[in-house]
Amino acid sequence: MSFEVIQRDKNTRARLGRLKTFHGEVNTPVFMPVGTQGAVKTLSPEEVEEVGAEIILSNTYHLFLRPGQEIIKKGGGLHRFIGWDKPILTDSGGYQVFSLARLRKIEEDGIYFNSHIDGSQYFFTPELVMEVQKALGSDIIMPLDICLGYGASYWETKEALEITLRWLKRSIDYKKNNNMETQLLFGIIQGGFYRELRKEAVERMLDMELPGFALGGISVGEPKDKMYEITDYTVSLLPEEKPRYLMGVGAPEDLVMGVSMGIDMFDCVLPTRLARHGVFYTKTGRRNIKNAQYKEDFSPLEEDCDCYTCRRFTKAYIRHLFLQHETFSYRLLTIHNLRFLFRLMEDVRRSIREGRLEEFKKEFLTQYLANDRENRLEKEEVWNRLLI
């Protein structure tokens, strides 16, 4: 199990890489579809593979609550349980504890929280989170961490970082003592939007001999310029030979920008969630299938798209299904949205290989954002500056 940088872009921090895991290789930069409960919503594993996925993400918090790690372990581990034989990354559940759970209480040993499902109380420790992920058998695992929202004070953020780093050390110790050699434990870099704290996090993690680094606490309500600024700064501190994972980020423009900053891995629920609300991606921005203009539009969602949806069906038909609340429409839109992102990543990797990423980035962002009225950034001048 290893990570190899195959080619670097001359003008940015972007690179092509290959991440080898117990269940196979992953070409980077890569987007990972999210299968929160063990399934990418509305799709079969075969459909997920067909759109281009090499790795998926599942959620420790949700799988711990239902069906529970013991059921999955008895079923042969997560891969066999869900029918997916390629790599799987599981996050620690820390973000979900802070975003979904109620009445949470942080102590040195871990986090007390009440399930968002039925209110039952649980106590997550770094060791328990590792134990759950061991039972799942996922290829890449994450330690328990504290994720704060945008606007947290310096001292609140510093305290959360200190606990996160101590929990990381405990997670590493658990892994070493419990026969988890086939699983790669990444460190999660916290520190909010304070450069000093991000730097401290990286410096202390460099001594822990981790196989990869995840950037956490990003895309938590901050403006886009803040997100890009702290991402770019944090990546500049990281070693070249290790993979970098930007957690919870996956909008098309963020993928392109993130790759140019040196990010190798992304995940996000956005493409599947948008699909269930009738929103689909095009090269000129997001569109909504509910719009009346598509009532008699017998063209595909996007003319040059090679996905199953665009090869077989028209906007008019998909709109009809969606307005009748037919679940097939959610599936068709999900297939298209995921394939759009995988085609985008294919184009990004090709542009790196051909030494023209900067040119591709400018062309894509100019076209995508100029017409994307439903997805305007908070400050257009930010993009003007980034495209110079």
Swiss-Prot record:
<feature type="binding site">
    <location>
        <position position="217"/>
    </location>
    <ligand>
        <name>substrate</name>
    </ligand>
</feature>
<feature type="active site" description="Proton acceptor">
    <location>
        <position position="91"/>
    </location>
</feature>
<dbReference type="GO" id="GO:0101030">
    <property type="term" value="P:tRNA-guanine transglycosylation"/>
</dbReference>
<keyword id="KW-0808">Transferase</keyword>
<feature type="region of interest" description="RNA binding">
    <location>
        <begin position="248"/>
        <end position="254"/>
    </location>
</feature>
<comment type="pathway">
    <text>tRNA modification; tRNA-queuosine biosynthesis.</text>
</comment>
<comment type="similarity">
    <text>Belongs to the queuine tRNA-ribosyltransferase family.</text>
</comment>
<feature type="binding site">
    <location>
        <position position="305"/>
    </location>
    <ligand>
        <name>Zn(2+)</name>
    </ligand>
</feature>
<keyword id="KW-0479">Metal-binding</keyword>
<feature type="binding site">
    <location>
        <begin position="91"/>
        <end position="95"/>
    </location>
    <ligand>
        <name>substrate</name>
    </ligand>
</feature>
<dbReference type="GO" id="GO:0002099">
    <property type="term" value="P:tRNA wobble guanine modification"/>
</dbReference>
<feature type="active site" description="Nucleophile">
    <location>
        <position position="267"/>
    </location>
</feature>
<feature type="binding site">
    <location>
        <position position="145"/>
    </location>
    <ligand>
        <name>substrate</name>
    </ligand>
</feature>
<comment type="function">
    <text>Catalyzes the base-exchange of a guanine (G) residue with the queuine precursor 7-aminomethyl-7-deazaguanine (PreQ1) at position 34 (anticodon wobble position) in tRNAs with GU(N) anticodons (tRNA-Asp, -Asn, -His and -Tyr). Catalysis occurs through a double-displacement mechanism. The nucleophile active site attacks the C1' of nucleotide 34 to detach the guanine base from the RNA, forming a covalent enzyme-RNA intermediate. The proton acceptor active site deprotonates the incoming PreQ1, allowing a nucleophilic attack on the C1' of the ribose to form the product.</text>
</comment>
<feature type="binding site">
    <location>
        <position position="307"/>
    </location>
    <ligand>
        <name>Zn(2+)</name>
    </ligand>
</feature>
<protein>
    <recommendedName>
        <fullName>Queuine tRNA-ribosyltransferase</fullName>
        <ecNumber>2.4.2.29</ecNumber>
    </recommendedName>
</protein>
<dbReference type="GO" id="GO:0046872">
    <property type="term" value="F:metal ion binding"/>
</dbReference>
<feature type="binding site">
    <location>
        <position position="190"/>
    </location>
    <ligand>
        <name>substrate</name>
    </ligand>
</feature>
<keyword id="KW-0671">Queuosine biosynthesis</keyword>
<keyword id="KW-0862">Zinc</keyword>
<dbReference type="GO" id="GO:0005829">
    <property type="term" value="C:cytosol"/>
</dbReference>
<dbReference type="InterPro" id="IPR050076">
    <property type="entry name" value="ArchSynthase1/Queuine_TRR"/>
</dbReference>
<feature type="region of interest" description="RNA binding; important for wobble base 34 recognition">
    <location>
        <begin position="272"/>
        <end position="276"/>
    </location>
</feature>
<dbReference type="GO" id="GO:0008479">
    <property type="term" value="F:tRNA-guanosine(34) queuine transglycosylase activity"/>
</dbReference>
<feature type="binding site">
    <location>
        <position position="310"/>
    </location>
    <ligand>
        <name>Zn(2+)</name>
    </ligand>
</feature>
<keyword id="KW-0328">Glycosyltransferase</keyword>
<dbReference type="InterPro" id="IPR036511">
    <property type="entry name" value="TGT-like_sf"/>
</dbReference>
<keyword id="KW-0819">tRNA processing</keyword>
<feature type="binding site">
    <location>
        <position position="336"/>
    </location>
    <ligand>
        <name>Zn(2+)</name>
    </ligand>
</feature>
<dbReference type="Pfam" id="PF01702">
    <property type="entry name" value="TGT"/>
</dbReference>
<dbReference type="InterPro" id="IPR004803">
    <property type="entry name" value="TGT"/>
</dbReference>
<comment type="subunit">
    <text>Homodimer. Within each dimer, one monomer is responsible for RNA recognition and catalysis, while the other monomer binds to the replacement base PreQ1.</text>
</comment>
<dbReference type="InterPro" id="IPR002616">
    <property type="entry name" value="tRNA_ribo_trans-like"/>
</dbReference>
<dbReference type="GO" id="GO:0008616">
    <property type="term" value="P:queuosine biosynthetic process"/>
</dbReference>
